[in-house]
Amino acid sequence: MTTQVVNVIGAGLAGSEAAYQIAKRGVQVKLYEMRPVRQTPAHHTDKFAELVCSNSLRANTLTNAVGVIKEEMRLMDSVIIRAADECSVPAGGALAVDRHEFAAKVTEYVKNHPNVTVMNEEITEIPEGPTVIATGPLTSPDLSAQLKKLTGEDYFYFYDAAAPIVEKDSIDMNKVYLKSRYDKGEAAYLNCPMTEEEFDRFYEALIAAETVPLKEFEKEIFFEGCMPVEVMASRGRQTLVFGPMKPVGLEDPKTGKTPYAVVQLRQDDAAGTLYNIVGFQTHLKWGPQKEVLQLIPGLENAEIVRYGVMHRNTFINSPNLLRPTYQYKQRDDLFFAGQMTGVEGYVESAASGLLAGINAARLVKGEEPVVLPPVTAMGSMANYITATNAKNFQPMNANFGLFTPLEKKIKKKQERNEAYATRALETIQNFVNI
């Protein structure tokens, strides 16, 4: 075993995964996590891999790119996906987890590894020696200043938004119905149907509601995958009906008709006592937020256990700064992982940590770093963030559009996606023992 130690800064999804991958390869890890010594504006616990936006790790099917990336990670012994599978709650064709159980399990697996030493302290300087920086979208000001100095790049600021969570017992079950869109998978969502009149009343209240003021010096950039519902609404009345409130595939079993609009609620914990309001990330003040949400049929008396909040998110200009191995171009033993690289989403963040961790371990063992080909989901993400246009670089979720095109064109979308998945999983088999 090598005596060299790898520093991993941040025990979120990416940092926890990186630490585990390094440790399982016989390399000592010092995992630095500033919580609970210093908290962030969005975290509430001292657990590793705390989920702060939604409890869903999104699609679990192989006809979706994020489902493919999960399967690749399973094959490569991802601690994040293993914990998620063990803590899953009903969510139709998606993989959703009991967030508290999930964080506890990741913490247990990583903390108890004999090659991992956890250091509960804030890092304010970039360490010398092999290091993985996975401090996430809420990197502390001192370390942010050091990273800005290191990269010579300006950070880009934008806001991720968290959806409200309500108590199931406070939902009027006579007004909602259990159904997944197009009856895919098990019926996992509670649906709140709206007539056009009810939608109009809700819409007018939403666009008139008061939001929390943003700091003047921070430029507003919203990532489409986690955009506040009031920002979507400001783009026009139909944005919601064709977005998070789209009713297609959600016929009301009582009437046999498709409602004008539907608000979906998804189970948030294993016990099934909490539900989050899907797609309703918001920056509304809490008083107006409650008034608006109680205009949704079935939620007139809803007990809100967590109001929607927004927090800053930060990412570096990876095309200028990183290689597809997640190494910093100007320093071979410095790696970045997670959302600060411009991968967007829980699963994508963990996947970047997996690859950065593998390559950090390989580096200290004198082995060549691995570049996964872009026919794989993980390889396509690494390729995107390092090879795309640096001038217009924005965060990106996993999607088949990032994959190397298929040699043969396939017209039908499902068959095409299945072909992408088959090719990816066949290719990743060549890397499972690295």
Swiss-Prot record:
Spell out the subcellular localization from the entry: Cytoplasm
- Which residues of the sequence carry a binding annotation for FAD? 10-15
* A GO MF label: flavin adenine dinucleotide binding
Q: Per the UniProt record, which EC number(s) apply here? A: 2.1.1.74
Which Pfam families does the UniProt record give? GIDA
What are its GO biological-process terms? tRNA methylation; tRNA wobble uridine modification
CC cofactor: FAD
Gene3D superfamilies membership: FAD/NAD(P)-binding domain
Q: Which InterPro entries match?
A: FAD/NAD-bd_sf (IPR036188), MnmG-rel (IPR002218), MnmG-rel_CS (IPR020595), MnmG_N (IPR040131), TrmFO (IPR004417)
Q: Which residues form a coiled coil?
A: none
A cellular component annotation (GO) from this entry: cytosol
> Major place of localization?
cytoplasm
Q: Which reaction does it catalyse?
A: uridine(54) in tRNA + (6R)-5,10-methylene-5,6,7,8-tetrahydrofolate + NADH + H(+) = 5-methyluridine(54) in tRNA + (6S)-5,6,7,8-tetrahydrofolate + NAD(+); uridine(54) in tRNA + (6R)-5,10-methylene-5,6,7,8-tetrahydrofolate + NADPH + H(+) = 5-methyluridine(54) in tRNA + (6S)-5,6,7,8-tetrahydrofolate + NADP(+)
Leader sequence residues: none
Keywords of the record, alphabetical order, are:
Cytoplasm, FAD, Flavoprotein, Methyltransferase, NAD, NADP, Transferase, tRNA processing
Specify whether Transferase is a keyword of the entry: yes
Per the record, the domain of life is Bacteria
According to its UniProt entry, the function of this protein is described as: Catalyzes the folate-dependent formation of 5-methyl-uridine at position 54 (M-5-U54) in all tRNAs.
* Entry similarity comment: Belongs to the MnmG family. TrmFO subfamily.
HAMAP family assigned: TrmFO (MF_01037)
Record's protein name: Methylenetetrahydrofolate--tRNA-(uracil-5-)-methyltransferase TrmFO
Q: What organism does the record attribute this protein to?
A: Bacillus mycoides (strain KBAB4)
Originating gene: trmFO
